[in-house]
Amino acid sequence: GQPGDLPNFDEVARIAENAVIVTTGDQFHHGIGYGTHPEEALDAEPDGLRAAGSSIEVGIRLIEAGDYWGYNQHCVIAKSDDRDVAQLFRYLRGPLEGTLLDIGYSDATELYGQPPPTWAAGGFMKFEKVV
């Protein structure tokens, strides 16, 4: 919730001044391998991706609002690994408007040796500076 306090912030801010910022992350981890109770676990298609998309949209709105603490809490619930970078991006660029363009997922059942469903979803998003 304090992006300006992240390690190496000054260096990142200097580099980002005249740069396009591109990041990767999975904003939604779901399923048995991520601690979801089996009776609540959704297959990625079609219901899981709808849930992931809704969750990612909530995250976008929190970043737009500059609600760093709220976004932090949202990332805990969504099991997002995008916590620091999204907040840092907003902090560096100021007011932004975000759009979820597409969403994809990776099946992680073999990776974690867990039963299905175990998967992670990431959104293809763009953020534009509000002028």
Q: How would you label these PLM feature ranges?
A:
Residues G1-N18, G31-V131:
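Flexible, D/E/H-enriched segments
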Residues V20-V22:
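Hydrophobic "anchor" residues on beta-strands that sit immediately upstream
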Residues T24-F28:
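Catalytic metal-binding/acid-base residues of hydrolase active sites
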